[in-house]
Structures are given as structure tokens and as C-alpha cells.
């Protein structure tokens, strides 16, 4: 039925649509080898991008009758030149769309790009904190601002207004040179410069501290003079022996005293300057304390109670051996020297009180000395071994692992 209808329409000069066979064909698609009307051509070639690229030919309308009769009856005018081709064109012509570019770019885009570049460069720049440069820039900005119109800041007379015609209305918003100078002076004083270096000691509150230090030095000098005078007087008298309390205290408990002194110094620093001066005075008084023994008064009070010597024989006292060393030592040599002097004088301190106390003290000191010495040797050996041991990234490494790594 469709073929007969198409052949019936094809018998005329016009060609029917191959798709709907109802309307006259207006387009010929070589890729599809089909004659299509307007509606069918639009629906077929809008289906996908591949169909849109098909090349189509616009068919002309039927010519006059004379031209129709001049042509051969078996061949139509529209069929001349058309041959059957492949459904997909091989290397067909492509429609090149002309894209026009502005040869001269707009000025606004260039300015915007340059401004962005300048901003990116300024981000990585170090600001120049120079007072001279800032002042110069400030003066230049003031000169540029003078070009703006005038606005009076307050109600003035006509003469004053004439004098101020050269100033800008924006000058009131910026500080003057006097204000800038005052600001720089304040900044210098805050930073430690300027006139701050010439403040007197009394203004800073250090006068009282200096006075206290001077008084302490004078008191120390007086105490040392008194001690020297007393030592000289003791040397001249044959029967007076002065035992320095500080010396005995330091020889027996030297290490304990050092710890106590450190604690005392820490407490003194926290208490303040006034309490520190009072503590120093008390320490000087303790140093001035001395133990004296007058043999004449002892013998007179002893009377006829018997011989005062425990050995029943008076010991020979060598006055040259009575003097004690002025320096204090925490070593065992000074302690032994101190006890040897007492034994030479016949004064046995351990026998007067507890008989075994002296032996216990000596054993304790010997044990402490050997323990400290052994600990020191042990730590030194560990330190040397640690320095010789191989390390890798700050940690000890076994020698076997080093050989494997190499």
C-alpha cells in the first residue's frame, strides 16, 4: 500500500516524503539516502549529535511545464547529480565556525590584573618601620590633600578664614607635627630610651637598698676587727684558749650546714630586703660567739678535790700546738687534725659524755666518705662508657646492628 502510494506520488514532478509518505519532500539526506519533508527532517536529524552533522540538500520546487516536457520523460530534473552514498560520510566538509577575538584587550581587564599582581607582591614584602620615611610620606599626603576644596572647621572671623584658605578640609583628621613628636617621645620612653636613662637612683627606689648594703659592709668590718682583736688577746694570755664555735660547727657538720645555708638564702630572698638585713646581723652575731676556757678560774674553783687530770699526771701542754687552723675544711684531714689537738691536750670529748659516741661518729663519717667516693666513681665510669658507646639518631645502638647495617 505504502509503495503504491509513493510510486503514485513519485509519478508526478514532486517527490513524496520517504518517512510519512503524506507530504512533499523538501530535503534530501545523502547519509540516510532519504527524501524528507520539514517535519520528518526535524524529527530525524535532531535525535542525536551524529544525526545533526548529516549534510542535507534543499530541494527546489517544480519548474514550469515547458521545462518539464523538455526533459526526458523517464528522468526527473531533481534526480540529476544524485548518487547513492554511504550512510556515514568519509571525510566530508566540516563547518568551521568563525570565532572573532578582540585584537585589542580592554583597559579595565589589564588594570585589574596588574592590581592583583601588585597586591600579591605586597603580601610577601616586609614593611619598612622607618620614622623618617613615614614622616615624608605623611607630608606628601598633606600636600596632595591641599588640592581639595576648603571647609571651615569652626566659626572664625573673616581674617582668620582668609589665612586658612590654604588648608584642606581633611587636615583636621590627621595629627599635627607636634602631636607626632610627642608620640615618638612617649614611645621612646616606653622602650627604654630617651630621658629614662638619666633617672636618679632615688627615684627608682634603690637608695634604701644601697644604704642597707653599706650598713651591712660596715657591720661586717666591725665584727671582723673585734674577732681579730680577741684572737690577739687570746694569744698573749698563757692560760686562755679560744675555741671558734664556727670552726667546730663546720668541721662536724660541714655538709649539713651547706644545705641549711642554701635553704636560708632562698628564704631570705623571698622575705625581702629588710628581713635579709636582719638575718645577716643575726648570722654575724652567731659568728662572733666564742668559747673561752680560763684555767686559773677552773683551778681556783676546783680547790682540794684532787688532781684535775684523769691520768693522775699533769700533761705537758705545748702552747704552739694550741692554735687551731683558721680555715675550715669538710675533709677528713681537718677533722683528724682537730681531734689530734684535743687528744694532745688531754681533753677526750667522747669520754666526758657517751663513751662510744666518738667511735660511732668516726665510723659514720668514714662510711659516708667512702659511699660518696664510690658513687662519684660509678657515675664517672657510666659517663665515660656512654660517651664511647655508638649512637644513631641520639639513641644507643648495639655493635652487631651497626655491622649488619654496613
Swiss-Prot record:
Its main location: nucleus. One of its GO terms (biological process) is regulation of DNA-templated transcription. Residues 357-399 form the CCT domain. Residues 63-95 are annotated as: Disordered. Residues 82-95 have a biased composition (Basic residues). A zinc finger (B box-type) spans 17-59. It is found in: Nucleus. Zn(2+) binds at residues 17, 20, 40, 45. One of its GO terms (cellular component) is nucleus. GO terms for molecular function: DNA-binding transcription factor activity; transcription cis-regulatory region binding; zinc ion binding. Keywords: Metal-binding, Nucleus, Zinc, Zinc-finger. Belongs to the CONSTANS family. This is Zinc finger protein CONSTANS-LIKE 6. The gene is COL6.
